[in-house]
From Swiss-Prot:
Enzyme Commission code(s) on record: 2.7.8.13
Gene Ontology CC, one term: plasma membrane
The species this protein was found in: Acidothermus cellulolyticus (strain ATCC 43068 / DSM 8971 / 11B)
Top EC class of this enzyme: transferase
Pfam families according to UniProt: Glycos_transf_4, MraY_sig1
UniProt protein name: Phospho-N-acetylmuramoyl-pentapeptide-transferase
Catalytic activity: UDP-N-acetyl-alpha-D-muramoyl-L-alanyl-gamma-D-glutamyl-meso-2,6-diaminopimeloyl-D-alanyl-D-alanine + di-trans,octa-cis-undecaprenyl phosphate = di-trans,octa-cis-undecaprenyl diphospho-N-acetyl-alpha-D-muramoyl-L-alanyl-D-glutamyl-meso-2,6-diaminopimeloyl-D-alanyl-D-alanine + UMP
Length: 354
């Protein structure tokens, strides 16, 4: 528990006090957000707000994780390092995208194919490494079985199938967080909630690990406590950043942050063997992503749009909802999804105790 508290506290403090330094740094260099002309007119006042704040989130989380491991007996593990590596790799892809937008003074950063290629490369490397490094009990950081709240033994993907599955999960989650990052504080707050859920899940898995004591309902998860430290570090980093990212935002996370956070969430789900459960925990991201998919499909098939604008949060903006109202209501949805996911996770464990 000490490591979890240290990770969250260090990441929170670094993010809270480091973000205003980043705001001044980016503002002095003109690293401001470009606003689409075809978006909601209320967003035009945000033009020039410093972006690439995701660098602070990522750095804070990594430092929080590193400092916490100075006080743990085992030190960093393969599972924790792989999740951090995945977040860092995707953060670099997002950083390039943000930097090109700023340098070229345009809304388009990396071309779609180039950006996708970067995500694919990072995700594939992660997927390949995740099924390496067996520990003394033969457990690897990830499993080649599909998992909900634990592995389904009958749903075996094999190594190649797992890498493809990991690629799909990483791509879907990182892009889902990216689509959600359209209003001040929305993606940051929702991400903090899901990371908080993963702290609880992985801590529970550590308390009920089959490696510690074989008992009904125990979890065959490698390094669950270190994963809890990672999740706590990212939750703390998001909370500290949210202080400055809440409306009216003084800085945006940019693709640097959204891709990194999405990657970390996907990595946590894969390593904790809660892959399908992530769709419940991150229900807000799923709803927002589906709104964009439905909008595109509807327009291509019928030449009609279902929503005034996609993703969904912009639909409500154009209906006249205040930005803060949308964010708070969407946070409520995110919180309910997290509560439901935790309930499902705990309920499944209870069934083993009867």
């Amino acid at each position: 528990m000490k490591g979890i508290l240290i990770a969250a506290s260090v990441a929170l403090l670094i993010s809270l006090f480091g973000t205003p330094i980043a705001i001044r740094f980016f503002r002095e260099r003109g690293y401001g957000q470009l606003i689409r002309d075809d978006g909601p007119t209320t967003h035009h006042t945000k033009r020039g707000t410093p972006t690439m704040g995701g660098t602070v989130i990522l750095a804070s989380a990594l430092l929080g994780y590193a400092v916490a491991n100075l006080f743990t007996a085992s030190g960093p593990t393969a599972s924790g390092l792989l999740v951090c590596g995945l977040a860092t790799g995707l953060g670099l892809v997002g950083f390039l995208d943000d930097f090109i937008k700023i340098r070229m003074q345009r809304n388009l950063g990396l071309r779609a194919r180039t950006k996708l290629a970067g995500q694919v490369i990072v995700a594939v490397i992660f997927g390949v490494l995740a099924v390496q490094f067996p520990n003394h009990a033969g457990l690897r950081p990830a499993s080649t079985h599909v998992s909900f709240v634990r592995d389904y033994p009958s749903l075996t993907l094999g190594t190649i199938g797992f890498v493809i599955w990991a690629l799909l999960m990483v791509s879907a989650t990182s892009n889902g967080v990216n689509l959600t990052d359209g209003l001040d504080g929305l993606a940051t707050g929702a991400s903090a909630m899901v990371f908080g859920a993963f702290v609880i899940i992985t801590f529970w898995e550590a308390r009920n690990s089959c490696l510690a004591k074989a008992a009904p309902g125990c979890y065959h998860v490698r390094d669950p406590f270190d994963l809890a430290i990672v999740a706590a570090a990212f939750a703390g980093a998001c909370a500290g950043f949210l202080w400055w990212n809440a409306a009216p935002a003084r800085i945006f996370m940019g693709d640097t942050g959204s891709l990194a956070l999405g990657g970390a969430l996907a990595g946590m789900a894969i390593m904790s063997h809660t892959e399908v459960l992530l769709a419940i925990l991150g229900g807000l991201f799923v709803v927002i992503t589906m709104s964009s998919i439905i909008q595109i499909a509807s327009f291509k098939l019928t030449r009609r749009r279902i929503f005034k604008m996609a993703p969904l949060q912009h639909h409500f903006e154009l209906k006249g909802w205040a930005e803060v109202t949308i964010v708070i209501r969407f946070w409520i949805i995110a919180g309910l999804a997290v509560a439901l996911g935790l309930g499902v996770f705990y309920g499944e464990w209870i069934t083993w105790q009867g």
